Amino acid sequence: MNAAFIAALLILGALTLDAMAYSFTCERIPCTNNSDCHGSDLCQCRPPRGDGFSYFCSEY
């Protein structure tokens, strides 16, 4: 019983880490062009979505 509980906690922890953002320096930083975004090469200035009106850095 204890081994199954420990295995479940390890699996839950691994799933939680996979669900976290890839880069904390890129997420939701206001920008005007790609040079304002820091971090990996995937971090780019993206157009607003939905009702938003300003550009933000994002890796997605």
Swiss-Prot record:
Location of the motif Cell attachment site: 49-51
Keyword terms: Disulfide bond, Hemostasis impairing toxin, Platelet aggregation inhibiting toxin, Secreted, Signal, Toxin
Leader sequence segment: 1-21
Post-translation changes: Contains 3 disulfide bonds.
GO CC annotations on file: extracellular region
Main location: secreted
Tissue specificity note: Expressed in salivary glands.
Subcellular localization: Secreted
Family statement: Belongs to the ixodegrin family.
Record function comment: Tick salivary platelet aggregation inhibitor that plays an important part in the anti-hemostatic strategy of ticks. Inhibits platelet aggregation induced by ADP, thrombin and thromboxane A2 (TXA2). Blocks platelet adhesion to soluble collagen (most probably through the binding to alpha-2/beta-1 integrin (ITGA2/ITGB1)) and binds to purified glycoprotein IIb/IIIa (ITGA2B/ITGB3) in a dose-dependent manner. In vivo, reduces thrombus weight effectively in a rat arteriovenous shunt model and inhibits thrombosis in a carrageenan-induced mouse tail thrombosis model.
Protein name (record): Ixodegrin-like peptide
Organism, as annotated: Ixodes scapularis (Black-legged tick)
Taxonomic placement: Eukaryota, Metazoa, Ecdysozoa, Arthropoda, Chelicerata
